[in-house]
Regions:
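Sec-exported extracytoplasmic/periplasmic mature domains
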Residues: 116-124
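Disorder-to-helix initiation segments
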Residues: 7-10, 100-104, 108
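Extracellular Cys-Trp
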Residues: 124, 128-133
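Sequence/fold signature of self-assembling virion shell proteins
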Residues: 2-38, 43-46, 53, 136-355
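Solvent-exposed, polar/charged alpha-helical surfaces in well-ordered, non-transmembrane soluble domains
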Residues: 113, 117, 189-192
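Extended, non-catalytic structural segments that build the interaction scaffolds
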Residues: 63-65, 98-102, 287, 297, ...
Length: 355
C-alpha cells in the first residue's frame, strides 16, 4: 500500500486545514523534517487501540475431489494493543513583551517556532531510539530500534526476527578505502533484501531512513558501479526535492536537539578516536569499533505501519491572557500512537561499514 492511501498524513492536514494556527504548526513540523509527515494518520478518539495481525497462523487450505464436502477452516490472528501518547506544551509570553512596540518579530510566534523545532528533534529521535526498558521515555512511543530488537525475545510488536538484517561488515564494505565492485554489489543486494523484508521489492510505499553520510555513500556506491545519475530525484507537493532508491523514498532524520549528534549514528571516519557511529553489532558507540551505521525501512499504510490520532491533527489554541493577568498562553498538544499491523512493516539493515 502506498504511503497515506485512504488516510491523511500531516502534509495533507497542513494543506486542508482552514485554521491559520493549525496550518502554521503543521507546516512548521513539515519544514523541520518531522518524521510524522510520513505516517498515515487515522483519527480515532481512543487512548488505546486494539488490532489483530497474522503471525504465521493462517488457515490450512483444503483441496477435495468431486462430490466431497467442504472443510471448515479458521484463522486465529494474534491480538495486540497500542496506546496513545500525549505531546502537550504551553508557550507563555509576558503581556508586556507581547505589547512591546519595539519588537522586531512576533514574540509569541518566535517562541512557538522554537518549541516546534525542539519538538521535531525530539519526535525524530524517539521514533527511532526510544525504549521502555528504563533507558528511554515511558511517556513516548516505543521506537523502531526497540521494536525490531524485541523480535528475537518477547516479540510484543509483531516484527519478524529476520527483519533485523546483518549487512556483513567487511563483506559489504562501502568505505572509501574498502569499496570494490564485489563489495558494492554485496551491499546493494542487502539493501534489496531490506526492501523485500518489508514486503515491497520495488520500494513502493517504503521510506528508507539513513543519515547524511550514508545517503552520500549510497550515491558513491552507485556511481562507482558505473551508473551516472546515482539516486533518482523528484519534487513533492511543497516543491521539496525527494530522493528515491527504486520507488523507496530516502530521508535523513537529522540530529538530536543538541543539533550535533546524529539520530542514526555513523560519521564515516575510519576506525579511530574520531569515529562516532555503531559497532558491528549495531550498538551506538565511539572509537575504533564505531565505523558502522544502519538503514531503517518502513512500509507505511493502514495494512502495515501507521498511526492514529485522537483528533484531526495537532490541537493549537490561543488561550489568550490567562487568569493570572500577566501571561499570554498558547497551547500545542496532540495525542498520537503508532500501530504495526503486519510482520513485514519495519526492518533494519545494520553492520554497514562506511568508515
Amino acid at each position: 500500500m502506498a504511503i497515506g492511501s485512504g488516510t491523511f498524513t500531516l502534509a495533507d492536514y497542513a494543506l486542508y486545514s482552514n485554521q491559520p494556527a493549525v496550518q502554521a504548526v503543521s507546516m512548521s513540523l513539515i519544514d523541520y523534517g518531522n518524521v510524522l509527515q510520513d505516517i498515515p494518520m487515522v483519527t480515532k478518539q481512543t487512548l488505546q487501540a486494539n488490532g489483530v495481525r497474522f503471525e504465521g497462523n493462517l488457515p490450512v487450505i483444503n483441496w477435495s475431489p468431486l462430490n466431497a464436502e467442504g472443510v471448515t477452516v479458521h484463522a486465529q490472528p494474534t491480538p495486540y494493543q497500542e496506546q496513545a501518547y500525549l505531546m502537550r506544551n504551553y508557550v507563555d509570553v509576558d503581556k508586556y513583551i507581547v505589547l512591546d512596540q519595539n519588537a522586531i518579530t512576533d514574540t509569541r510566534a518566535s517562541q512557538a517556532k522554537a518549541v516546534l523545532k525542539a519538538l521535531t528533534y525530539d519526535v525524530n529521535f524517539k521514533f527511532f531510539k526510544n525504549a521502555h526498558d528504563g533507558t528511554g521515555d515511558p511517556n513516548a512511543p516505543v521506537g523502531l530500534r526497540a521494536r525490531i530488537d524485541d523480535a528475537a525475545g518477547a516479540n510484543k510488536f509483531g516484527v519478524r526476527p529476520e527483519n533485523k538484517i546483518d549487512c556483513g561488515g567487511a563483506t559489504a564494505d562501502i568505505s572509501q578505502a574498502g569499496i570494490s565492485a564485489a563489495k558494492g554489489n554485496a551491499f546493494l543486494e542487502m539493501l534489496d533484501l531490506l526492501l523485500w523484508s518489508v514486503g515491497s521489492q520495488d520500494g513502493t510505499g517504503i521510506v528508507l531512513y539513513m543519515n547524511d553520510y550514508m545517503k552520500r555513500r549510497l550515491n558513491f556506491v552507485l556511481r562507482s558501479l558505473g551508473t551516472t545519475g546515482g539516486l533518482d530525484e523528484s519534487k513533492d507537493q511543497f516543491n521539496r526535492t525527494i530522493t528515491t532508491y527504486k520507488n523507496a523514498v530516502i530521508r535523513d532524520p537529522g540530529v538530536k536537539a543538541d543539533q550535533t549528534t546524529r539520530i542514526i549514528a555513523g560519521n564515516a571516519i575510519p576506525a579511530g578516536s574520531g569515529s562516532v557511529g555503531e559497532t558491528a553489532a549495531g550498538v551506538d558507540s565511539t572509537g575504533a569499533s564505531a565505523n558502522f551505521t544502519s538503514i531503517y525501512a518502513v512500509n507505511f499504510g493502514t495494512d502495515y505501519f501507521f498511526g492514529w490520532q485522537f483528533t484531526d491533527g495537532p490541537n493549537v489554541q490561543d488561550l489568550g491572557l490567562i487568569n493570572n493577568g500577566v501571561i499570554y498562553r498558547t497551547l500545542i498538544d496532540w495525542a498520537v500512537g503508532l500501530m504495526n499491523n503486519n510482520t513485514r512493516s519495519i526492518a533494519r539493515l545494520f553492520d554497514i561499514k562506511i568508515g
